[in-house]
């Protein structure tokens, strides 16, 4: 999974000593990198976890300061997502540059990528920026979360202002009718079509989704008949398409921060992560 971007290495190295942020500190990331891996039939589950453990071992051995977490699909095509966050694009650049200079880490990741690639049908990468004004009480600490709803909105060209108004109206309705609602909104800036927005909503249990469905009527009541009519009309006018997917966190394929591990060691440090393999074991020939 873990591929450090070659793109950012081409940028001007300004302030190369800037601190790389940990991906899982208790603040909302400004820059979010999502790598997607689409698995071949029969290559998910334990088979993929074993391949991904090589990345986790390599990062742990290098004591790499930037962390990531993985999720696997519960809907749609069989795939895994790997999320890494940064305080800025400069931090992302510096992280990639430092990894390139670490020969042992780079070699271990190259071997892991080769083996992991045998399981994949395809892979891609997207870069997103946090849109605070479009978010509602986002959760900065996901260490206790176990599931993630991912909603993708494709906004029509020239309709950004209308889209902002739609989100503003929806936020007001949820704040009034469903005070426990929360989400983080991210806009895709690289790796996809323009006008793509990602709404992420995490859950401790799927029972929270049951409660949300049962409470939808509260949102409708908060908006009122005229408000819902206006919202629906504006949404249809500015949004070209949407999709909704559900994912489960995967601790076996994640490289969590110490804080996350301390919050729930039984979950975030499964046996497969307990002891990274010795460096000599990494030097096997490629198949």
Regions found by a protein language model. Give the residues of each.
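Short S/T/G/P-rich N-terminal loop/turn motif that feeds into the first structured element of a domain
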Residues: 22-287
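Bacterial N-terminal signal peptides
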Residues: 8-18
